[in-house]
C-alpha cells in the first residue's frame, strides 16, 4: 500500500531472560563446504575448509551470524558449541526458529562430509513488555489494522481491553474500531489451546505449527 500511513510504537524491553539456542558441532570436516543456518527466514552461510575441527567450524558459524546485524540473535562459541542469544529479553525469543539446511540436498544445502551439528533449545526466554504506554500513545487515533508482535496472555489481554465493545475502541462512546493481528508458533495442541484462550472478535491470532 503506497498510500497508507504506518505508525510504529517502540516499547521498553521486558524484564526477564533472553532466549538461547545452541548448535553443537561434532566431527572434523573431510571436505570443503558450507554450513547453512536459517534464523527465521534468513539464511546465514558459514564456510568450512577441509580439515577444520569443531572449534574452527563453530567459530566460522559465530562470525557469519554476527556479520548480519539485523538478525534477532547474537552468537558466541566455545569448544565447538555455538550459543545464540536473543537480542531482546522475553518470551517472544522462544519462537524464533533456527534450523540447518532448510532446502536439503535438492536445494544444494548439505553439511560438509564429516561434520554433524545438533540444534537444541537452551535457556527459555522469560518476561513480557508492558504495553500500557503504547496503548496510551495511540490515544483516540483510529487505526484500521494493529499489528501486535507479542502473543503472551498479558500482552493480548491489554489489547483486548483496548478493543472492547463497552469502553474500548469498538464502544459507542469512542467508535474508533480497527482490528488486531498477532501470531503464534507451537504444536497443534498448543495452538488449539491458544485459539480457545484468545477467542476475541477484534483480535486475529494466526497459528503456525513448528517444523
How should each PLM-predicted stretch be described?
Residues 7-11, 20-26, 125-138:
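Short, charged beta->alpha transition segments
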Residues 1-2, 24-99, 146, 161-166:
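Extended, beta-strand-rich, solvent-exposed assembly scaffolds of outer structural proteins
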Residues 9-18, 55-60:
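Short, basic/low-complexity N-terminal boundary segments at the transition from targeting/disordered tails
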Residues 2-15, 118-123:
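A broadly used, surface-exposed interaction patch
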Residues 1-2, 63, 138-211:
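A glycine- and small-residue-enriched flexible loop/hinge signal that marks low-structured segments
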